Design a protein with these regions (language model features):
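Nucleic-acid endonuclease domains
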Residues: 1-219
Length: 219
């Protein structure tokens, strides 16, 4: 399924509760965890898509969900992709070009759905916003992403050279950041380039909360 094919259904989520959406189809997900991807999986099933391990959710793009307050303001950053398998593409003498990177492939066409999870009963969780952005339609934004990517790569390299532990640490651009994403037992990142571990935990790219503020103004 292409993202445009899902556009109408995704727009119609805004203002509805999880319970209202669940009544529209037979869910194979028995319970929803706030941070375990349940809502994203529910939306894919709502759209008639399979739950598989493809690089992107749609044939031409990716679905992301974001926890918000009741007014649609982001309460957390938005996970994009882990970096352990591509670390040397980021910290090599010449980092891989952003427009050829795994990061670009993951974000070149994105549908972003906000959901307020303040109620203890997940049936009362309410969808608060729906945004889309793409490389095709938002060239200026992707120039910012490119700048963020370059800035983050330089910060990661600098941390390895100058930090006390010679590990990477949280690195920020304007709309994108790299920070730790892991749970015990931790998964340190090994760099073949440096022939050593360059972190004590796994790390990942995230969209910062500032991105949704920008997208709201862009509407």
């Amino acid at each position: 399924m292409f993202l445009n094919d899902a556009h109408k259904k995704l727009i119609n989520l805004k203002g509805k509760t999880v319970g209202e959406i669940l009544t529209q189809f037979e869910s194979r997900i028995k319970e929803f965890k706030i941070n375990k991807g349940g809502i994203g999986q529910m939306i894919l099933l709502y759209l008639g898509l399979p739950l598989d391990s493809k690089l992107t959710d749609f044939d031409d793009g990716e679905l992301k969900t974001n926890k918000t307050d009741k007014d649609g303001n982001s309460k957390e950053t938005i996970f994009i992709t882990q970096i352990s398998s591509i670390i040397d593409e980021l910290i090599g003498e010449k980092s891989k070009d952003f427009f050829q990177s795994n990061l670009f492939k993951k974000i070149k066409n994105v549908a972003l759905v906000g959901i307020c999870k303040d109620d203890k009963d997940f049936n009362n969780w309410k969808f608060t916003y729906f945004y889309t952005f793409s490389f095709e339609k938002n060239k200026k934004l992707f120039n910012e992403f490119n700048n963020d990517y370059k800035t983050i790569c330089e910060q990661l390299k600098n941390y390895i050279k100058t930090s006390k532990d010679n590990f990477i640490h949280t690195s920020n651009g304007k709309y994108i950041q790299v920070r730790s994403k892991d749970s015990k037992p931790y998964h340190p990142i090994y760099s073949k380039k440096f022939e050593k571990y360059i972190s004590n935990k796994n790390h990942a790219f995230y969209f910062k909360k500032d991105l949704t503020k920008f997208l709201e103004k862009l509407k």
